[in-house]
Amino acid sequence: MRKEEIQAEHKRLRKVKKNADAGQVRAESIGKSSQTPMFRNYLTGVGPLVKPIIKRNDYLREFSKFEKDNASAMQKLLVEAEELPKATAQNWNTKREAKIGIIADRFLYESLEVAADFIPITPENFREAIPQTDVLLVVSAWRGLNEEWVNLPRRTSGKRELLEKTIIPFTKDQGIPVVFYSKEDPPNYESFVSMARLADHVFTSAEEVIPKYRKDIPDGIPVEPLRFGVNYKIHNPLGSMRHMGREMVFAGSWMSHKYPSRAASTEKMFDGALRAGLPLYVVDRNLDLDPKSFKNLEKYMFPDRFVANLHRPLPHDELLRLQKLLPLAFNLNSVMGSQTMFANRVVELLAMGTLLISNYSAGVNTRYPSVAIMDTELDTQQFLETLSDDYLRYCQVEGIREVFLHDTAFDRVDKILNSVGISTPTDDHRILVVANSQAEFEQFQQAQASDFECTYVPSSEASNIKGSEHGDLVIFANRLEAFGPDIINDAVAAYRYSAPDALYITAFDSEAEAYEPTTHDNGISKPATAYWINAGEMVDDATVETSMTIKSSFTSNN
């Protein structure tokens, strides 16, 4: 056989194999689709038939059969979410006085801005703005706050050259330290590492790449991990226990060509939720992409068995409200082996009182034990089918506490400022524990899984307590239902996202309405469990203007 004939035969066989592989994928997809509620609805005459989807037009055509009903269901949830309370103040942390120049994308900027005075740096304002700052924070940004840093990841772009050859040297000439933070490690390490070479201090989202930085940047530049943090005004649990439904809303993109492991996890968890009978809405961020601007849109299509669950993209603020309203959510990590790099929605959703169902992440598994890690479709199905209201509430409480003790914007900003020698306030507040006796105080103290120091106040002297300079937390141990291990931690966490005059602390499985700020015109009639007293103030139920009930990790069955 001649060489040309052999090559032609190889080409034909490759085509046959490609078609066979595609056929196998299609057969598996049809097999799974035939087991979904969507297909059962078709067989019983309740819903339309979803035909096999090959092209983008097929995808949109089949989606149109379900668009109206899904949009209506989501709109009802959005109306409910619109009534959720908003956080406007917290008592524990003071805004840092440092002025931080920042180059970042909007989500990262908004996650930090509450903690200090941030000044956005642009290609136009840097000469005037940078001399006003104490430090320049350069973040691995894709577009900036208002498109001013588009193309920054491209090492040959004009914006990159301006930053590295003009702005950073200009900053150092002013005697202002430069901090670089890569939130894109490890997948986009190479795109931004040249910025790290110019910094005085480097932070990375993935501690596993620190050895690479040691090799690639000059000796003497410190490198540390830095996880994502939350802005309490955006991510908080206020109103998070109103809604008792089990709807699940996932907002994201299908990118199996780039993240095959994540795509496989997505299918398993979505299939498990549908088998468990939960309403699932998939906000497809790529659904409205213009085919004139993007090629091969088929690679962004979710598997056709999920087309009945699709919803068009939603504004970010609406998604935030939905996520805060709903007690359950999926999280999909693209990076699974890192102890510090995982989806930022992990800390955001936990802060909003969400029980998170996630694929595996080493860091999530280590740091957030309340997150339900799912490996298979059956895991997901059985977890959701057996999930009790009590366990749901327990996980919500655990997540809220963990994030607001360790993962706030103040925690992250303090680490950034301290890295270049800028001191930050310690936010010291006395924690005064009122008990009927020294023995009762010691019993309470020994039960706590807390590092916070607390001071004993005999109940006979409670009326004489006055707030110190920065305000104090007063806990009445003699009013508690039980000495759960997290009373102090939960109270402190509450004052990192809210500012009520009084707190009622109850069991996670109690019937009490929780995380709902309440105003009072004439004080409170029922004495509270804890109080915040500002400098010179005293505990006085008659002057309490705001209160809130929170839940803790003890059970009402004690």
What are these regions (language model features)?
Residues 37, 41-44, 51, 58, ...:
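C-terminal amphipathic helix plus adjacent low-complexity
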Residues 66-82, 171-276, 407-408, 413, ...:
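Catalytic core of nucleotide-activated saccharide and alditol-phosphate transferases
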Residues 232-233, 237-325, 435-453:
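Conserved catalytic-core segment of nucleotide-activated headgroup transferases in glycan assembly
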Residues 468-488, 492:
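Short beta-strand-to-loop acidic/aromatic patch adjacent to the donor-nucleotide binding site
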Residues 113, 196, 220, 299-316, ...:
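Catalytic binding pocket for nucleotide-activated donors in carbohydrate/polymer assembly enzymes
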Residues 78-218, 337-338, 362, 366, ...:
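Extended catalytic core of nucleotide-activated donor transferases of GT-like folds
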Residues 1-69:
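Boundary detector for helix-to-coil junctions that initiate low-complexity/charged tails
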Residues 207, 484-550:
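Conserved catalytic core of nucleotide-sugar-dependent glycosyltransferases
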